[in-house]
Amino acid sequence: MDTCAQLLAGVAMVAGSYGSMLFVDTKKEAANYSLGAQVFMLGNITNIAVGLSIGDLSMVVAQAGLAFFTIPMFENRKVSLALVLMYIYMTLQLGVANHFHFTASWLGIAASATAVYGAWAMAKAKWDIMNWCWVVADLAFIYIAILNQLLGLFVLASLFVWHGYLRIKGYKRHGLFGYTK
């Protein structure tokens, strides 16, 4: 497996989990909500680079959909512009390196559609739909991680499946690992 993809998956794991922690922790002030959205978005964009580097178009589409629904949660539009420009640059750079040869499995396409629908549900505050969609999508991303030997993606998707399961069961999240009934 490509070392670049492994490193990117590790960065995405840290950014996604930390951003998620800041994003949903209701004890924190509102500034952490915007910061959490930005860090989570960095994780999305890094996962787009991972998807491009392994040539999995469905992962790219899923992460781009998540990023699209995360952008309105920012307060700082300069950060939004910088992240969008970073995404365009990575798409061109990694696309050229792969000769724009991408694949998409049926499982990846289904996971992508489910993740994007979950992101839409998040934007509309339909939490039950979001939780179920993201658990299903992250289970598929665990499979993609195993298939491509991406430890960072495996850990991140596993963490999000666990978080989703606890939310479905009615637990309230506090921080990265803290839950109360």
Please provide the spans of the model-predicted regions.
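Alpha-helical membrane-protein topology signature
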Residues: 1-181
